[in-house]
């Protein structure tokens, strides 16, 4: 009924506000004095340039870009294009650390990049694939990012050839996606060991559900010692249209 729908929308809005408050708090806890941090990084970057250390300059710029994006207002939306750029900066940093041990392969349809999405949905999933998938590999680690536009939907696939996840872990994530007692579920399923962004996979899933009014779908395929695939199906909301 219309009344039930109204109650559901109010609950979802309340939960979204709660999520945003928590994310803002985490952001505030992490930033301390962001202007000082960014100014310092800018100075170091210029010093690296003057000393001819181009790789170091580029690395510092990537770190600053990711930090600035992670500390931005979580109320604003992004485009997939902005999300992809942050992922590329993240991989530049990781490949600086690990060299050819890890390869990043992307196949992206340009007309999908203007789609409007909640901020910080790709980097946490990519980071999860790296940390829990391929980071331990001495060679031949791969993470693939695939983005396409199909039938008024955006399809995003994040595929790694890493260690995979136990069936129990996958089932927990799947049950979380289908959980209807939203606020209780979020409180009882907070990430116990957050990744460096402070935003875990479950948080990303929940924000997708709230932003798209449960019209987003998430699929997970995983096999131990073979890898994991996260597949997102999200409505094609074009920014500015």
Where is each model-derived feature located?
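Two-component histidine phosphotransfer core
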Residues: 1-221, 229, 233
């Amino acid at each position: 009924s219309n009344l039930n729908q109204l109650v559901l929308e109010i609950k979802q809005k309340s939960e979204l506000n709660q999520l945003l408050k928590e994310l803002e708090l985490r952001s505030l806890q992490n930033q301390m004095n962001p202007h000082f941090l960014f100014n310092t990084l800018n100075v170091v970057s210029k010093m690296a340039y003057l000393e001819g250390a181009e790789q170091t300059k580029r690395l510092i710029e990537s770190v600053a870009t990711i930090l600035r994006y992670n500390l931005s207002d979580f109320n604003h939306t992004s485009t997939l294009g902005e999300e992809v750029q942050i992922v590329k900066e993240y991989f530049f940093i990781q490949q600086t650390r690990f060299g050819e041990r890890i390869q990043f392969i992307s196949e992206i349809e340009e007309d999908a990049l203007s789609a409007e999405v909640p901020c910080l949905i790709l980097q946490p999933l990519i980071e999860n694939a790296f940390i829990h998938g391929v980071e331990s590999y001495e060679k031949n680690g791969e993470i693939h990012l695939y983005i396409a536009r199909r039938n008024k939907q955006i399809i995003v696939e994040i595929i790694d050839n890493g260690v995979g996840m136990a069936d129990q872990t996958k089932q927990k994530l799947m049950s979380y996606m289908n959980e209807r007692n939203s606020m209780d579920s979020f409180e009882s399923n907070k990430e116990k060991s957050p990744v460096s962004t402070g935003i875990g996979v479950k948080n990303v899933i929940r924000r997708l559900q709230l932003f798209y009014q449960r019209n987003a779908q998430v699929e997970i395929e995983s096999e131990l010692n073979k890898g994991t695939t996260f597949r997102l199906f999200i409505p094609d909301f074009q920014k500015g249209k």
